[in-house]
Amino acid sequence: VLTQHEVKIAPSTYYDARKRRPSARQVSDERWKPIVLGCWQRQRRVLGARKLWLRLRREGHDIARCTVERLMRELGIAGVRRGKRTNPVDADPRETRPADLVDRHFARFRTNQLWVADFTYVWSWSGWVYVAFVFDVHSRRILGWRAATRMTTPLVLDCLEMAFWTRRREGVADFAGLTHHTDAGSVYTSIAFTDRLIEEGIDPSVGSVGDAYDNSLAESQIGLYKTELIHHEGPWRNVDQVEAATADWVQWFNTERIHSSIDDLTPIELEQLEYALTEPLEQAG
C-alpha cells in the first residue's frame, strides 16, 4: 500500500515490522479487554470508568483506573449520563399539610431515621406507568416500591407498606422517631397516608410547593432509576414489563451498585457495617 502511494520503504524495515512481536502493553490490553467488557455488561452497562474500576477491584482484579478509562475508550463503551427530571407535582393546596421537618438537612440523619418518598412516570406502549419509591436517606437503600397504571393514594400506601415489611423482616419493631419526608403532592398529603404514618409513630414531613430541592435526595435517586433502567433499556410494553425490570434493578441497586456518597459502598453493605458496629455497643449497654 505504501509503495502504491510512492512512499519509499526498505524491504528489511517492512519484514521486521511484520515479524515484530506484540508489546507487553498490547498483550496486557488483550487480556484485560474481555474482563473489563464482561464486568461492564454484568453491571447493566451503566457504569462509568470510576465505578467500573472500583467494581473490578472488588472482584480481585489489580488494574489501574487509567487503564480502565483507556480500555473503555478502545472498546467503545461508556457509562450512562443522567438527564433532567421534569415530572410535575400535583400539589395539595391545603395550608394544613404537615410541616417540613427536614429543611434540606438530609446529612444529619442516620439509617432508619429519615425516609424519603417520591414517584415517577414511565411511558409504555400501553399507556403511562407510575412507579413509587421509598428510600432510606442515610444508606440510599430502596425500602419499598410499587408500579401501577394510576397514580393514587393506594399506590403510595402500598409502597409504604412494603417499606414497613422490609424493615420488620430485619427485626425493626418500632418506627417511633422516624421521619417520612415527601414533596407536597396530593397523594402524600392525603388524610389516609398521613394517618398511616401517625399510626406507626412516624413524623410526617412535607416540603414546600414548587421547590425541587426540598425533596432533592428522592429526586436524585429516581433520576438514577430513569437513567440506568428506564431510558437505558426501554421502550416498554406495559406495566408488567416495567414492574419485572424494576424488581431486578432494585435488587441490583441495593446489593451491587456502589455509591460515592456512602464511601463507595452498596446500601446493604453500609447498613450491615453500621449494624455490626452498633450491636456490640447495645449489648454492652
Predicted regions and their residues:
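Charged DNA-binding/catalytic regions of mobile-element recombinases
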Residues: 1-285
